[in-house]
Amino acid sequence: MGSGTRETTTQEGALRRLFSFPNPVNEVSARLVAAAVVVMCVLAIAFDLEWMTVLLAYGFVARVLTGPTLSPLGQLVTRVITPRLGVRERPVAGPPKRFAQGIGAAFSLTALVLAGLGHWTAAEVFLALLALAALLESAFALCLGCKAFAVLMRVGVVPDEVCERCTNIWATTPGAAA
C-alpha cells in the first residue's frame, strides 16, 4: 500500500506542476507572446482567417491553465526566442499575468463561438479588442488585465495573499508588478 500512495502523490505532484503558472513571469517573454497575439489577430481580421480563432483560443486557455507549458507559442517564446535575444530577464508578478491571460481566453473564446455561429463581423470586434490590449502590453508594457487585477485587489475582491507582490501595484514602475 505504501508504494501506491507514493505513486499517487507523485502523480498529483506532476499534475500540480503541469497546471501551474509561473510566478514570477519574465515580462520580456510576456510581451513577445502579446506581440504574436497582435499579429495573429490582425492576420485573422485582414484575411478572414476564422480558423485562427481556434489557435488564439487554445493558446490563451493553455496559458491560463499551464503557463507556457502546453502553449506552442509560449514554448516558442520562452525556449527559443527570449533566450536568443540576450536581454536580461525582467521578473514581474505572475497572478496578474494569469488573470490577463484569462481575459484573453474569454475574448478569444467569444470570438471562436461567434465565428462558429457564422457571426464573423462580431468575432472580428472581439479580435480587434484583443489585438488592442495585446498591442498595449507588447509595445508599452501596459497590461490592462493586470491593471484590472490591481483594482480587484484594491477593492478586496482578490485577497492580498493571492499576490503579495502586487499589494502596491500602482506605486511600481510601469510593468514592474503588472
Kindly give the residue locations of the regions a language model identified:
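Membrane-interfacial helix-loop segments of redox and metal-homeostasis proteins
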Residues: 1-178
